[in-house]
UniProtKB/Swiss-Prot annotation:
Keyword Nucleotide-binding tagged: no
GO terms of biological process kind: DNA-templated transcription
GO molecular function, one term: DNA-directed RNA polymerase activity
Name of protein: DNA-directed RNA polymerase subunit beta'
Self-association state and partner proteins as the record states: The RNAP catalytic core consists of 2 alpha, 1 beta, 1 beta' and 1 omega subunit. When a sigma factor is associated with the core the holoenzyme is formed, which can initiate transcription.
NCBIfam families linked to this entry: rpoC_TIGR (TIGR02386)
Binding site residues for Mg(2+): D460, D462, D464
Top-level taxon: Bacteria
Keyword set includes Lyase: no
Residues given in the record as Zn(2+) 1 binding sites: C70, C72, C85, C88
Family assignment from sequence similarity: Belongs to the RNA polymerase beta' chain family.
Listed cofactors: Mg(2+); Zn(2+)
Cofactor: record remark: Binds 1 Mg(2+) ion per subunit.
Gene expressing this chain: rpoC
């Protein structure tokens, strides 16, 4: 018996391994795997259904069909284990060996492996240095290739067609060797001497100058070195033996009716065997060459189809005309092995059902139908019944359960007690899509779900279904309870704000009970305590909304954690006093002394979590929900058609608009305005009218008149049902109410343009047929968009997860002091995100000093929490350097200090947290809320006119940032730099707003001056680009000849004369080379120089410049000498929403990107070519001038003689992230990408922490390009992992050798995923064939560091509680002990991990 147990134990044992290597299999290796050769194409005998001998299902080779029973039935039972039957030759064993035993086919002629031939770049082609076309001609028997030229004039590797071959035979006889087919290729590969070739290439590379040639050579060198290092031999890419897959992995199943269902692979194998046998026979008969050749070609094609059908030529099809599924198709794509069976599997102990509301549940409970529970917990019930002695055998227990005896229900209740189950709703977009609950048995067939977790699941009760899973092992139950319980997931991992927030009815109820009404019953009464209020309210003596005074006892937690109790009398309402009863001790009364709108409730729960902790918050959230439901029921809020009050002014507003439109139409008819102007004006008018109607409507809805206690008529906030729903945030918005009670407004045509005639009716009045027809397009487009959006958003999430999946917190501190500079995020002058919010939950990288002193007020290494944020705001600090995932120096993974706070838990992140996946989910999950379309700016959308001044919103002190300015004679400043900014700081020195100042802006205030709110502090002309002098003197015209380089124009209206510079293409031949300029001279006519330089003050004038000064005029500092008209910015399509986010993460180069200065220096223009200008920048440090050709149609922001800094914009356009990284560095790139992505999400009102975007960015910046190889083994231009290069450089530095130099490279997320170290992860993502081919040739090792690789090989992932297991294994491995991690040790490590996460 013991023997039997050992046997069973050995069956399930898996080798412990640390890495997986993939490589090419040698023929010997294939034979060593094999249990015999398949010689016949037969499968099974159609009469007996027994496998044929030597066929594709042969029992002698692959093992018995039935457990422990040979084919002929001579040996049966376990006792004969291992015996080989002398009659049928079958070994007696388990039938499951048919899943693992392989066979082989000895090929009569070698065959090239199609992956190494056709998967680009062709490996065989690279090694042999021949083109793919040529190799194919040899392989498919179209031409001969010379293998050994001997003493002839032929060259090795030369191709000969039939004629040339026979000529050569006549000429040289058999002095040379030329063959065709795979044997020729194999010979050539066999003949390659890797060492010699590598040496030759390494010498050749430094001597070549052509870029393309260097690329080609280094590719070839890399491949050769890969072969040499991996122990693969080149000739193994040509197969001489073909392995055969075990038969149970390509099953043949008899269907009823005598037909068979078979795997396509059997057909493909059959083809190969048939052709191979025919070829053997032909060779034995020494058939004519041409027939043999044809058969060999067919064999090559058959093997190609087996390995990768359809890769070359037409795919082989089966009987039903569809292509057969080859081995390659088995592993790639969504239905392939990786994604279908390895990364996700169907699991046992699960069920699904429709969900309904469970308003009476507690937050940690879910209602589980008895029927489901009985099925899910069956084994536990059987065990319990036997243990209790209610059933003697499992069979008896089974019977009891089937009969549903009363005892069974008692046992079920006991089994379920404190056994959590997991609930999951598809699509699981973030980790809150699976949470654990304690089941409560219910009647009925639907699962009951707690309303507060609906937001996390994005669930509603209109027929959604959910799946239930049972965690079986003790560890799994422990994790479910300690980590996944819904009560532990109160905060969202995406932004750290509560996700367990009441919505809809609950919000409405809480809002209703905290509103106040004038002259309600009981107004003005004073109560002794909350209990009295409750009594009086229940007795009906005071209305819910009555204003009263109450004496309350509140306990308030101070910042240092001490608790202060105080008693005071507050002015409040009955409802608020009732609500305060459920508020936990520690929160002040003020939190409920206001109308509770959705935002306020969210803030309340957040504050509660931070002040009194998790447990109290959960109880409080539940109580809030119960209260909300109760009072929304009492309120009786409902919607009737009379709630939509249409404002009386509507008719007047629409009448006025119609009159104005008529006026514009008549202007258009008489030719005063163009079609475009008319269109814009009309649409403007209607937009305005629509806004006015909705303003009037909201004013009408939101107020009502009542009589107060003195009998006067006063206004109070309305109790209109619809207004309350919108105002509280329960449902609906002003925009929706506008369509119901205002006017629907402008609609768009299918092509996106806006129709000039709006829908003036609203839904209460009803639409006419035409109006209804106009509306249909928009409604349908919405539905189509949603479907597209879901797919695109899912794909973006998948790419993000894939790029970041191996990023796990692996250490506490990497010790870097690098970080990102954080400033308040300001947009269009408004502070969108104050500094405090941005640094919350981050670790400070360098000490923060009190402004203007040397006192450290926030030391480096501080984790900023809510109290520090207040402190930072109080001390009016406006920039802080914080640690960031981008700068973390941990080698594998990331450190806790650089990441900061775990947003979902509110403390520093634990080691083992999979921050990469969390980041990917946080960015991907709201993807479905983003828009899909690109916006065409134009018409009503771009009503924001070009800014022409800065008007400050708050009073305060002026601060000027990196602004170069000159002072005009009238005392105003003129900006002469491009990246200047003006900020306003309040009395504490905090920046409240910030504005960009364009070149030539006239600034009417000085640094440090105080301004009032609403003051205009700077002005400029938005339509022209000025050229400003920086010194005073006399104007001299150079090269300005009338009608050759300039033309004079007189304005008809004003009678003033302007000088316009002609475009080069409009000038006569004489003027093509002349460059008109304005020179500044002093009174004596001597040249003046630009301040601080020895460059003469000469301003070259670009084409179309308008000169506003006369020759010889005296001008002062800061005067405008010429203006360049700006084409009003063309209507660029602004890519918005999801496509924009995808573009940023894929690091795509935008079309017509902005041009940045490559070096700092002085601008000049060199010789022009046909369509381009030559821009020359002479660096200030005296190095080589930098030249760049720029198309003439690009509008340049700079002119001759101007100083620019590296990375400044020379020509406007969308920014290219690669340029930002190259010229301005990682921090500038981070700032750009984070802000751009946040802009898209902010527009939709979605909050995501910057950290997540930085985490993904870290993964995009993993690679570097070697610029100088030093003494390392790297080749210039190679892309390497940053960590690899740093480690190598450390080693070189310690040996006093030259280190390699590199530049950072930004990869898009798809590219970054495919270039990861792990080939398993890359292969299961995309382009499986290419990844595996490359990995096999280079003999790659996968060290299984990421999550995905470990999931594929079926291990615990190295994150969370699984990290304990992995680090324990690593420790053991280092100590060289026999590797057996026992369950108890894992348990211990697990509890330790859980304890640390609980603190």
């Amino acid at each position: 018996m013991k023997d039997l147990l050992n046997l069973l134990k050995n069956q399930g044992q898996v080798e412990e391994f640390d890495a997986i290597r993939i490589g090419l299999a040698s023929p010997e290796m294939i034979r060593s795997w094999s249990f015999g050769e398949v010689k016949k194409p037969e499968t099974i005998n159609y009469r007996t259904f027994k496998p044929e001998r030597d066929g594709l299902f042969c029992a002698k080779i692959f093992g018995p069909v039935k457990d422990y029973e040979c084919l002929c039935g001579k040996y049966k039972r376990l006792k004969h284990r291992g015996v080989i039957c002398e009659k049928c030759g079958v070994e007696v064993a388990l039938a499951k060996v048919r899943r693992e035993r392989m066979a082989h086919i000895e090929l009569a002629s070698p065959v090239a492996h199609i992956w190494f031939l056709k998967s680009l770049p062709s490996r065989i082609g690279l090694l042999m240095d021949m083109t793919l076309r040529d190799i194919e001609r040899v392989l498919y028997f179209e031409s001969y290739v010379v293998i050994d030229p001997g003493m002839t004039t032929l060259e090795k590797g030369q191709l000969l067609n039939d004629e040339q071959y026979f000529e050569a035979l006549e000429e040289f006889g058999d002095d040379f060797d030329a063959r065709m087919g795979a044997e020729a290729v194999r010979e050539l590969l066999h003949a390659i001497d890797l060492e010699h070739e590598i040496g030759r290439l390494r010498e050749e590379i430094p001597q070549t100058n052509s870029e393309t040639k260097i690329k080609k050579l280094s590719k070839r060198l890399k491949l050769m070195e890969a072969f040499q290092g991996s122990g693969n031999l080149p000739e193994w890419m040509v197969l001489t033996v073909l392995p055969v897959l075990p038969p149970d992995l390509r099953p043949l199943v008899p269907l009823d009716g005598g037909r068979f269902a078979t795997s396509d692979l059997n057909d493909l194998y059959r083809r190969v065997i048939n052709r191979n046998n025919r070829l053997k026979r032909l060779l034995d008969l020494s058939a004519p060459d041409i027939i043999v050749r044809n058969e060999k070609r067919m064999l090559q094609e058959a093997v190609d189809a087996l390995l990768d059908n359809g890769r070359r030529g037409r795919a082989i099809t089966g009987s039903n005309k569809r292509p057969l599924k080859s081995l390659a198709d088995m592993i790639k794509g969504k239905q392939g092995r990786f994604r279908q069976n390895l990364l996700g599997k169907r699991v046992d102990y699960s069920g699904r059902s429709v969900i309904t509301v469970g308003p009476t549940l507690r937050l940690h409970q879910c209602g589980l139908p008895k029927k489901m529970a009985l099925e899910l917990f069956k084994p536990f019930i059987f065990g319990k019944l036997e243990m209790r002695g209610l059933a003697t055998t499992i069979k008896a227990a089974k019977k009891m359960v089937e009969r549903e005896l009363p005892e069974v229900w008692d046992v079920l209740a006991e089994v379920i007690r404190e056994h959590p189950v997991l609930l999951n709703r598809a699509p699981t977009l973030h980790r809150l899509g699976i949470q654990a609950f304690e089941p409560v048995l219910i009647e009925g067939k639907a699962i009951q779900l707690h309303p507060l977790v609906c937001a996390a699941y994005n669930a509603d009760f209109d027929g959604d279904q959910m799946a239930v899973h049972v965690p079986l092992t003790l560890e799994a139950q422990l994790e479910a309870r300690a980590l996944m319980m819904s009560t532990n997931n109160i905060l969202s991992p995406a932004n750290g704000e509560p996700i367990i927030v009441p919505s809809q009815d609950v919000v409405l109820g809480l809002y209703y009970m905290t509103r106040e009404a004038i002259n309600a019953k009981g107004e003005g009464r004073v109560f002794a305590d909350l209990q009295e209020v409750d009594r009086v309210f229940r007795a009906g003596e005071a209305a819910l909304h009555a204003k009263i005074k109450v004496r309350i006892n509140e306990t308030v937690k101070e910042r240092d954690g001490s608790v202060v109790k105080n008693t005071r009398i507050v002015d409040t309402t009955v409802g608020r006093a009732l609500l305060f009863q459920v508020v936990p001790a520690g929160l002040p009364y003020d939190v409920v002394n206001q109308p509770m709108k959705k935002k306020a409730i969210s803030k309340l729960i957040n504050q509660c979590y931070r002040v009194v902790g998790l447990k109290e918050t959960v109880i409080f959230a539940d109580q809030l929900m119960y209260t909300g439901f109760a009072y929304s029921t009492i309120s009786g809020v409902s919607i009737g058609v009379n709630d939509f009050v249409i404002p009386d002014e509507k008719a007047r507003i629409i009448g006025n608009a119609t009159d104005e439109v008529k006026e514009i139409e008549s202007q258009y008819a008489s030719g005063l305005v163009t079609q475009g102007e008319k269109y814009n004006k009309v649409i403007d008018l209607w937009s305005k009218a629509n806004d006015e109607v909705s303003k009037a409507m909201m004013a009408n809805l939101s107020k009502e008149k009542v009589i107060d206690r003195e009998g006067k008529e006063v206004e109070q906030e309305s109790f209109n049902s619809m207004y309350m729903m919108a105002d509280s945030g329960a449902r609906g918005s002003a925009a929706q109410i506008r369509q119901l009670a205002g006017m629907r407004g402008l609609m768009a045509k299918p092509d996106g343009s806006i129709i000039e005639t709006p829908i003036t009716a609203n839904f209460r009045e009803g639409l006419s047929v035409l109006q209804y027809f106009i509306s249909t397009h928009g409604a349908r487009k919405g539905l189509a968009d949603t479907a597209l959006k879901t797919a695109n958003s899912g794909y973006l999430t998948r790419r993000l997860v894939d790029v970041a999946q191996d990023l796990v917190v692996t250490e506490i501190d990497c010790g870097t002091d690098q970080g990102l500079v954080m400033t308040p995020h300001i947009e269009g002058g408004d502070v969108v995100e104050p500094l405090g919010e941005r640094v919350l939950g981050r670790v400070i990288a360098r000490d923060v000093f009190k402004p203007g002193t040397e006192d450290v007020i926030v030391p480096a290494g501080t984790l900023v929490d809510e109290q520090w944020v207040e402190f930072i705001e109080l001390n009016s600090i406006d920039e802080v350097i914080v640690r960031s995932p981008i700068n973390c120096e941990t080698r594998y993974g990331i450190c806790a200090k650089c990441y900061g706070r775990d947003l979902a838990r509110g403390h520093q992140v634990n080691i083992g947290e999979a921050v990469g996946v969390i980041a990917a989910q946080s960015i991907g999950e709201p993807g479905t809320q983003l828009t899909m379309r690109t916006f065409h700016i134009g018409g009503a959308a771009s009503r924001t006119s070009a800014a022409d001044s800065v008007q400050v919103k708050n009073g305060g002190m002026v601060r000027l940032h990196n602004l170069k300015q000159v002072e005009r004679a009238d005392g105003n400043l003129v900006a002469v730099s491009r990246s200047g900014e003006l900020a306003i700081a309040d009395e504490f020195g905090r920046e409240r707003e910030r504005y960009k100042l364009p070149y030539g802006a006239v600034i009417s205030v000085k640094e440090g001056e105080k301004v009032e709110a609403g003051a205009i502090v700077a002005k400029w002309d938005p339509h022209t680009h000025p050229i400003v002098t920086e010194l005073k003197g006399t104007v001299t015209f150079v090269g300005m000849e009338e009608n050759i380089t300039i033309k004079r124009q007189t304005d008809e209206l004003t009678g003033l004369t302007n000088i316009e510079v002609l475009d080069v293409k409009d000038r006569p031949a004489a003027g093509k080379e002349i460059r008109p300029a304005i020179k500044m001279v002093d009174a004596a006519g001597k040249d003046l120089y630009l301040p601080g330089t020895d460059v003469p003050a000469q301003y070259f004038l670009p084409a179309n410049a308008l000169v506003g000064v006369a020759d010889g005029a005296q001008i002062g500092v800061g005067d405008v000498i010429a203006r360049i008209p700006q084409e009003t910015s063309k209507t660029r399509d602004i890519t918005g929403g999801l496509p924009r986010v995808a573009d940023l993460f894929e690091a795509r180069r935008p079309k017509e990107a902005s041009i940045l200065a490559e070096v700092s220096g002085t601008i000049a223009f060199g010789k022009e070519t046909k369509g381009k200008r030559r821009l020359v920048i002479t660096p200030t440090d005296g190095s080589e001038p930098y030249e760049e050709l720029i198309p003439k149609w690009r509008h340049l922001n700079v002119f001759e003689g101007e100083q620019v800094n590296r990375g400044e914009v020379i020509s406007d356009g969308p920014s290219d992230p690669h340029d930002i990284l190259r010229l301005l560095g990682v921090s500038a790139l981070a700032k750009y990408i984070v802000n751009e992505i946040q802009d898209v999400y902010r527009l939709q009102g979605v909050k995501i922490n910057d950290k997540h975007i930085e985490t993904i960015l870290r993964q995009m910046l993993r690679k570097v390009e070697i610029s100088e190889s030093g003494d390392s083994s790297f080749i210039k231009g190679d892309q390497m992992e940053l960590t690899q290069v740093l480690v190598e450089n450390e080693r070189l530095a310690s040996e006093d050798k030259f280190i390699s130099k590199f530049t950072r490279v930004l990869l898009g997320i798809t590219k970054a995923s495919l270039s990861t170290e792990s080939f398993i992860s890359a292969a299961s993502f995309q382009e499986t064939t290419r990844v595996l081919t490359e990995a096999a040739v280079t003999g790659k090792r996968d060290y299984l560091r990421g999550l995905k690789e470990n999931v594929v090989v079926g291990r615990l992932i190295p994150a969370g509680t699984g990290l304990a297991y992995h680090s324990e294994r690593k420790r053991r491995r280092d100590a060289d002990k026999p590797l057996r991690v026992s369950a108890s040790e894992v348990e211990a490590a697990l509890t330790e991990a859980l304890n640390s996460s609980g603190n």
